[in-house]
């Protein structure tokens, strides 16, 4: 795991507030995520965790506050622009192309990086052919990394839930993000699947140098893989520290962990 010592923040949230029809979802949230770390976001259901990720990658526009990513400050941004900047994302509900193969789903994550025009791709001429080979090689490496070789041509609709989550992670990784936002990547998984996914997340962080921000409810996983934990409750930040410090924070214990943690 990485320490923020001598590292710069890749993400800075400052005084972020978000409301829907007058109902506050997030109130005055500020925290930093440091380059190369794994930051877990925890809290009860309805605490504002997913809303916060949606603000970071432009799905929601906050009424107040600013976000700085990789040195660039903004108050609003479209998800497409966030992806171009280097922010990748997976969601609670799997959003894959059900009828497409594992390979083609992961390949779709490379679309933003393709420079050839429509006709070059349609006719497979000029730079399109070379580009196709380069992107396919990168995708094959991701497939091997995630252990999906034997099902690479299988339609994702026929795969078990845990494998679909792995494919979604691969598609996000295919875009070469500087930072990955993972919304409950282990929800609904068996213990074995959780172990595999947590290992993949750590290897992505270590081998690709990708900063990770994830929402997770399994405190064993959070304690094991996180460098930094942010805790939300009713849309407000009540904890922001190393895992051991957060586990001993009385406000966090009262709001989320309970006395038996």
Q: What do the predicted segments below correspond to?
A:
Residues 2-261:
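Glycine-rich phosphate-binding loops of nucleotide-dependent enzymes
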